[in-house]
């Protein structure tokens, strides 16, 4: 994933015991690595849901240019989720390269 163009990544209402939260849990594992936080200044916000809660997980991304993306991770696998988040990061990377 390209974290250099993301200011804030919020992974909310993750139930660690629910199959519906699988993509959100895997995204959290990728985003919480030391390199993501230290190199890029990524602001990572997480919240866990209790085992008995039926709330759906959600992923919110705020990019460097201010664009916001809200995704329902229950409807896709981790590959599609990271692809969706990276699509706009790649656009920002291309714009930056064109300005140089």
From Swiss-Prot:
Organism: Schizosaccharomyces pombe (strain 972 / ATCC 24843) (Fission yeast)
UniProt xrefs under InterPro entries: Ribosomal_mL53 (IPR019716), Ribosomal_mL53_fung (IPR042776)
Name assigned to this protein: Large ribosomal subunit protein mL53
Domain of life: Eukaryota
Gene3D superfamilies xref list: Glutaredoxin
Alphabetic keyword roster: Mitochondrion, Ribonucleoprotein, Ribosomal protein
Any Gene Ontology CC annotation: mitochondrial large ribosomal subunit
Localisation per UniProt entry: Mitochondrion
Protein family according to the UniProt entry: Belongs to the mitochondrion-specific ribosomal protein mL53 family.
Xref: PANTHER family: 54S RIBOSOMAL PROTEIN L44, MITOCHONDRIAL, LARGE RIBOSOMAL SUBUNIT PROTEIN ML53
Listed GO MF terms: structural constituent of ribosome
Predominant place of localization: mitochondrion
BP GO annotations: mitochondrial translation
Annotated Pfam families: MRP_L53
Protein purpose: Component of the mitochondrial ribosome (mitoribosome), a dedicated translation machinery responsible for the synthesis of mitochondrial genome-encoded proteins, including at least some of the essential transmembrane subunits of the mitochondrial respiratory chain. The mitoribosomes are attached to the mitochondrial inner membrane and translation products are cotranslationally integrated into the membrane.
Subunit organization: Component of the mitochondrial large ribosomal subunit (mt-LSU). Mature yeast 74S mitochondrial ribosomes consist of a small (37S) and a large (54S) subunit. The 37S small subunit contains a 15S ribosomal RNA (15S mt-rRNA) and at least 32 different proteins. The 54S large subunit contains a 21S rRNA (21S mt-rRNA) and at least 45 different proteins.
């Amino acid at each position: 994933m390209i974290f250099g163009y993301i200011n804030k990544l919020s992974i909310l209402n993750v139930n660690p015991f629910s199959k519906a939260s699988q993509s959100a849990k895997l995204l959290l594992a990728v985003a919480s690595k030391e390199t993501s936080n230290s190199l890029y200044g990524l602001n990572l916000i997480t919240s866990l849901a209790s085992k008995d809660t039926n709330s759906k997980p959600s992923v919110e991304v705020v990019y460097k240019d201010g664009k916001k993306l809200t995704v329902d991770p229950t409807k896709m696998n981790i590959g599609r989720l990271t692809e969706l988040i990276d699509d706009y990061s790649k656009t920002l990377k291309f714009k930056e390269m064109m300005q140089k």
